[in-house]
UniProtKB/Swiss-Prot annotation:
GO terms for cellular component: cytoplasm; nuclear matrix; nuclear pore. tRNA nucleus export receptor which facilitates tRNA translocation across the nuclear pore complex. Involved in pre-tRNA splicing, probably by affecting the interaction of pre-tRNA with splicing endonuclease. InterPro entries: ARM-like (IPR011989), ARM-type_fold (IPR016024), Exportin-1/Importin-b-like (IPR013598), Exportin-T_C (IPR045546), XPOT (IPR040017). Belongs to the exportin family. Pfam families: Exportin-T, Xpo1. Keywords: Cytoplasm, Nucleus, RNA-binding, Transport, tRNA processing, tRNA-binding. This is Exportin-T. It comes from the Eukaryota.
């Protein structure tokens, strides 16, 4: 079998082997891994001295042995233990073999796994025997590697383990401490003391072993002067100094009493050591290790400081001695180094907030200055790489927390330094882009600090404080300066616009917005050569107008802006493209263009001028959009169907019209008659466009969007247009499920907006039945191949339509329009509507749909139950005048009663431990309560009869009926949950 294994491994690793043969080899290898004979053959191969045994084969047999160690009997483990120790003896003592590193590491891993399974009971002498094999350089190498692997198995805190594994590992550690600890430490010390006898790798790994084991071994074995001196000597050896740094960090991190920790740190003279190491290397990896060590030293000192009040002066002396190194790392040219001391800086500043004795103004001033230096883009950074800039912003955010904490600790220092930095960065002679950007960034931070009152001014005095006055003056100075207009760097330009939008309250309180609007409209803003800046500034221009809401009394200035922006308002649709992942993505800048239309709508609406002036400006915007739509409509039907760019152009123009009107309406200025007429004209244009593009979903979507924005302005005048719009959409032959869902939300908004409006009521009355029929038609349709019910996406969309449909019913009932459901035009659909609600309630495939259906049944029982089929809503204008619907009362109560008990008790998946089913049960309890509220004792009689047929005990039935009567809604929810739980578990 050994030969077969060797051949199988060779075939499996061959790049030229026949695929069928390779498949057979893999199958054979899998059998070897799981069979006793395979394990024995692998052990035999491992012990073979044959020179033909390849490294790949050795790796494979080691892998098989390792995988089987946890599975075999103790007797087999004993045999494997002896075989592996024999392998070590023959290869590392007798023959001094030198295998590749990956094979040595694999062997170490196998031995570590074996150790975990034999040390406690089968071979307590395991570590002693290992030590015997370390007499040669190769033997010492594998000896140390095995100890590293054992640490990975039992001591590595970064590896998650089960409670059983952790319990085993603790037992292994206890046994090592009791039996082998001193012997092990002495062996490591001996290796390090005799450096000339060992390879560089062996020494490095031994240093690492000390760092790994010190956390759970007796610290006194390591910190004796001779041994600690040996360890520290490796801090000066190029090959081992990085590992030595990590080991020293582990030593000082050892848990101990604060007074002992302070003695240890003093004994090691650790702050001086860190200081000398920090100045002694241009090796980045080592520098990072020293930075980690400095960070750990600082954290340990702070722990001692907080716990030892009588050692304050000594700790502070050591902290002060550490700070020069920390500040040096903070300003290191590589950010990865700087971040390594962030935890210590953060903890130090937090400690300052708790213990004022730690505050040292000179130190905090220097730290503050270093943070500012680190916040500046590097001189060789062009600032154009978004990924690297995003990483830098994360670092800045952490540095900002340090700045803010210093502001809280020493407000006067903050108020002196930050404005000076801002002024020097922004208003000095021709600063480079990095300096200007830093100034804008600091100004934004300063504004945040003032708004969040970091300097601790009484809230009522904030707007009259020195900080507020300084900030406002800086904003005025910035806006009056040429900092942005003279800068050609995109990051400076964007930073300015982001700044004035983010801190618009300060801008609005102390400056005239006109200069800012001019900058927006310049070549550094909305006409910027950089697409990123240009498109972002369009959005920020809109945000600025929306937030500041400038009261524009000078029409010529607004007309100047409008005229200047005309080139940007030209809509030219571009077909979507596919990205590198083959996903369809929008092409062009239309989505950003919409912000311009909304901003101009706002700006014109905010103007303090007569309507005729506003109308002139609106015409300037609408005329080009209407002209674009006219061109689209003029295209022949064949052109519209064959050239997708035409309906897309129509969609864009309609969206622009709707977005502009939304902006105008958001100005909260009451629209005069001329503006209402203009929007009414736009509504006509939309309907005409839709009638010509009724087959195109994107045009239907844009038309619906536009009308939703027209409604608040047109009010009653929109009904004629709405009737046509709704008919065109509902009658579209290719109406999709998701589109209808969105459309139902639009109808729900109409119901709410025009509650009590006779014209809209009549409109909805005429259209409700066709809408409901369309809903049921799309829900029923199962695709040409009758397979929609197997497609998750379709199921999800249909559930979305069910929710939208029920939300529309809810809107009708909650807005006192329930009579719509029982008018002569619509009452024929009522049975189908009610039947659908019961159907959805019983279907638990989507619990949110089921819960919503039960909620709607509560609504229907409220308005139609217990009143003989008449509408029970005094605020429904038409409810009283409509005749009763015979039988609906009894139907609702009887079907609801069946639902309330069949759903929780007959549906096996109804599990009250599931939060979703618990919510449904709570809704059912409210349905029971509302049925009782509407029918009173009659309902209790129905209930008694029904529960008797269910076989419920009289005592339990009486208790249930009593609870229905006596408990309020909240208490009955809890009762019903308990009731169902007890019965289901009985």
């Amino acid at each position: 079998m050994e030969t077969q294994i060797q051949q199988a491994v060779e075939i499996a690793l061959s790049g030229t082997a026949d695929p069928a043969l390779k498949s057979q080899a893999y199958e054979f290898i899998d059998k070897i891994k799981t069979s006793e004979n395979g394990l024995q053959s692998c052990v035999t191969i491992l012990l073979s001295s044959s020179s033909v045994t390849s490294e790949a084969l050795r790796f494979f047999v080691l892998q098989v042995v390792e995988e089987n160690i946890p599975k075999v009997s103790n007797e087999r483990l004993y045999s494997i233990n002896n075989s592996l120790l024999q392998f070590l003896r023959e290869n590392y003592i007798v023959n001094h073999q030198s295998y590749p590193i990956y094979l040595r590491n694999k062997l170490a891993s196998v031995m570590a796994t074996l150790f975990c399974h034999v040390y406690l009971t089968i071979n307590p002498q395991f570590l002693v025997q290992l030590l015997e094999y370390s007499s040669s350089p190769p033997g010492t190498d594998i000896y140390v590697r095995i100890h590293l692997a054992i640490h990975a198995e039992i001591g590595d805190k970064l590896i998650a383990r089960s409670p059983q594994q952790q319990e085993r590992n603790n037992a292994l550690k206890d046994s090592i401490r009791a039996n082998d600890m001193q012997r092990l430490v002495q062996s490591w010390r001996s290796i390090l003391e005799n450096a000339e006898a060992h390879t560089s790798d062996t020494l490095t790994n031994t240093v690492r072993v000390v760092g790994c084991y010190v956390s759970w071994m007796e610290i006194s074995l390591f910190v004796v002067p001779d041994f600690i001196g040996v360890i520290f000597s490796y801090l000066r050896k190029p090959d081992q100094r990085t590992a030595a740094c990590e080991t020293v960090a582990e030593i000082i991190s050892k848990k101990m009493k604060p007074e002992n920790k302070l003695q240890l740190l003093a004994l090691l003279n650790i702050t001086d050591v860190v200081g000398s190491l920090a100045q002694d290397s241009d090796d980045l990896e080592f520098t990072e290790s020293v930075a980690r060590l400095a960070n750990q030293v600082g954290l340990e000192l702070l722990i001692v400081f907080e716990a030892q009040s009588d050692s304050t002066s000594e700790v502070m002396n050591q902290l002060m001695g550490l700070w020069p190194s920390v500040l040096g790392f903070l300003t290191h040219e590589f950010d990865d180094v700087a971040q390594l001391v962030f935890p210590y800086i953060q903890q130090y500043l937090l400690a300052c907030k708790k213990q004022k004795t730690l505050i040292n103004n000179d130190l905090l001033k220097e730290l503050f200055a270093k943070c500012i230096i680190k916040m500046k883009f590097d001189g060789d950074d062009d600032g154009l790489d978004d990924d690297s800039a995003a990483q830098f912003e994360e670092i800045r955010a952490k540095l900002k927390t340090f700045q803010d904490t210093i502001a809280i600790l020493v407000p006067n220092l903050y108020l002196d330094l930050v404005p000076a930095v801002i002024s020097e960065s922004l208003f000095s002679n021709k600063p480079d882009w990095q300096t200007s950007e830093l100034g804008l960034y600091q100004l934004s931070n300063f504004a945040d600090g003032v708004r969040n009152n970091l300097v601790g001014v009484p809230k009522k005095e904030l707007t009259t404080s020195k900080a507020f006055a300084v900030l406002r003056e800086l904003f005025i100075q910035l806006i009056d300066s040429s900092v942005v207009s003279s800068s050609g760097h995109p990051r400076v330009q964007l930073s300015f616009f982001e700044l004035v939008v983010r801190h618009y309250t300060f801008v609005a309180s102390g400056t005239n917005p006109d200069p800012i609007l001019k900058v927006f409209g310049s070549s550094v803003g909305m006409f910027n050569e950089s697409e990123k800046v240009r498109l972002r500034s369009w959005y920020l221009f809109f945000r600025f107008i929306k937030l500041v809401k400038p009261q524009m009394s000078n029409p010529s200035f607004v007309e100047e802006i409008l005229l200047k922006l005309q080139p940007l308002l030209v809509i030219k649709a571009e077909l979507p493209v596919r990205d590198e992942d083959d996903d369809v993505v929008d092409n062009g800048s239309f989505s950003s263009q919409l912000y311009l239309f909304e901003a101009l709508g706002l700006l014109i609406g905010l103007m303090s001028v007569d309507d005729s002036t506003k109308l002139r400006m609106v015409d300037a915007i609408f005329s080009s959009l209407f002209s674009s739509l006219e061109s689209c409509v003029a295209a022949s039907e064949s052109e519209r169907n064959s050239q997708p760019i035409i309906p897309l152009q129509a969609h864009h123009a309609l969206m622009a019209i709707g977005t502009f009107v939304r902006g105008y309406d958001d100005s909260n200025v009451k629209s005069g008659q001329v503006m209402v007429d203009k929007v009414d004209n736009a509504a006509q244009v939309v309907v005409i466009t839709l009638s010509n593009f009724a087959k195109h979903e994107q045009v239907r979507e844009a038309s619906r969007f536009a009308f939703a924005r027209f409604v608040p302005i047109l009010r009653d005048r929109c009904t004629v247009h709405l009737s046509k719009l709704i008919s065109l959409i509902i009658n579209a032959s290719n109406l999709t499920v998701t589109e209808l869902s969105d459309f139902l939300s639009f109808l729900g908004q109409l119901v709410h907006t025009f509650k009590g409006n006779a014209n809209v009521y009549q409109l909805l009355n005429d259209l409700l039945t066709p809408v409901v029929e369309k809903i049921f038609s799309l829900l029923k349709y199962n695709g040409e191949n009758n397979d929609f019910d197997t497609m998750p996406d379709v199921i999800r969309d249909k559930n979305g339509l069910k929710k939208a449909y029920m939300n529309l019913l809810s809107a009708i009932i909650m807005n006192n329009s329930s009579s719509l459901l029982v008018t002569e035009s619509n009452k024929a659909k009522l049975p189908e509507i009610l039947s659908s609600l019961f159907e959805y309630s019983y279907d638990l495939a989507d619990t949110t749909v089921a819960k919503l259906a039960v909620t709607q049944l509560i609504n229907f029982v409220t308005v139609l139950g217990g009143s003989g089929g008449k509408i029970n809503d005094p605020n429904d204008t038409y409810g009283e005048s409509l005749p009763a619907i015979e039988g609906v009362d009894e139907y609702l109560i009887e079907k609801s009663m069946h639902l309330c008990f069949e759903l929780p008790f007959q549906k096996t998946e109804f599990d009250l431990k599931d939060a979703q089913f618990r919510l449904i049960a709570q809704e059912i309890s409210q349905l029971i309560k509302i049925c009782y509220d509407r029918k009173g004792d009659t309902y209790l009689q129905y209930l008694s009869t029904y529960l008797t047929t269910m076989g419920m005990a009289p005592e339990l039935m009486n208790d249930f009926g009593s609870s229905v009567v006596k408990l309020d809604n909240r208490a009955f929810k809890k009762y019903f949950i308990t009731f169902v739980s007890q019965l289901k578990s009985a």
